[in-house]
Structure formats: C-alpha cells, structure tokens
Amino acid sequence: MSKTPGIDMSSGSLGQGISAGVGMALGAKLLKKPFRTYVLLGDGESQEGQVWEAAFLAARYRLDNLTVILDYNGLQQFGWQKPGEHMLPPIENPTLKWQAFGWNTLEINGHNIHEFVSAIQASQQTQGKPTIIVAHTTKGKGVSFMEDQFDWHARVPTNDELATALDELGQTGLFQESMAGGQS
C-alpha cells in the first residue's frame, strides 16, 4: 500500500476491486472515518457476478462514501462486448442497472475533464447511497493506431509507437522521456 499514495490496491479483471472497495467504504463507516473510497471498474469485468453482489451490498449499507467510475468503452481484453461473440452478454444500459440496485448514477463523456471533475464533486454531495459515474470512453482515444483496438489492452508500445502516439496526442519533451519503456 505504499508504492503509490492514495492507491491501496489493484485487482484483476474478475471484479474483485469493487468488493474490496465496498469493504473499505463499510469499514470507514463503521469506524466513523471521514475518507471516501473510489473504485475504477471496467465494463468487461461488470459481467462478473461478484460485481453485482458488491453493488447490492453497497446500496444495502447506504455507502455514500463510495464512488465507482465505470469505464464504459465496449471493449474488453479479447474483443468487443457484442451479443453472440462471448459466453456472457454485454452490459447494456448500465445506468438503469445500477439505478435498479439503488445507486446514484451519473453519466459523462469520460474524455471531458470538466464533466469528470463535476461528477466527482457531485458524488461527494450524495447522501444515503453509493454513486457510480458511467464514463463513456473510447479505448486509445486520440491515437490513430490504438483507438478502438482491443489488442492494446495489455500491449506495451515500442519506442517508435510511443513517439508516434505522443506526437498524435501533442505530448513532447520530458513527458515523452519519462514514459519511454517499450522497445524500438
């Protein structure tokens, strides 16, 4: 828990993060601690039953100190979330599903920082229920060869690809040097 300040844990694609987040938020409530818990959740991992069990419990315990940010881009590690292409169907209409579980729901353009900040601030004002921010995003947005390409889920760019991507995003100099880590 000491490598990245404010980041207490990371989890894989099986939905464990939200369960841990619910536990942290519940612990804070029980101990009367004033902190908030934030969970990043992918739409692909929302196919896991554990996510919905945690969602139910968070609403049941009125965890208004919990904010989940759902990255809703339609892609998961091995492809698009389309009916018939996977064993599990995609999570359609996530806002309605989370509302049905008793959550406060906010929808934003996940690429708009102003909408993002406003949603975080709104989530902090919600009382009596947890909040989910459904952030509609495009995987790899702004990089021509990465945009909407599921194979970039876990792939590291080469130095040349990194340079091209940073150029397309308008990033140069020190940032580019600090991000280098791939192979040419």
Where are these regions (language model features)?
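A short, conserved beta-to-alpha structural element at the edge of catalytic cores
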Residues: R60-M87, E92
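Generic beta-sheet signal
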Residues: F35-V39, L66, K129-A135
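Acidic, glycine-rich active-site loops and adjacent beta-strand->loop/helix elements
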Residues: L41-E48, Y72-L75, H111-I113, K139
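Glycine/aspartate-rich loop-and-adjacent alpha/beta segment that forms the canonical ThDP
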Residues: I113-S184
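Short acidic, glycine/serine/threonine-rich loops at helix termini
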Residues: Q50-W52, F78-P83, S118, V143-D148
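Short beta-strand segments
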Residues: A25, L40-L41, I69-D71, V134-H136
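Conserved thiamine diphosphate
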Residues: K33-R36, Q81-A119, G170, L174-G181
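Cofactor-binding active-site loop characterized by glycine-rich and histidine/acidic residues
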Residues: M1-R60
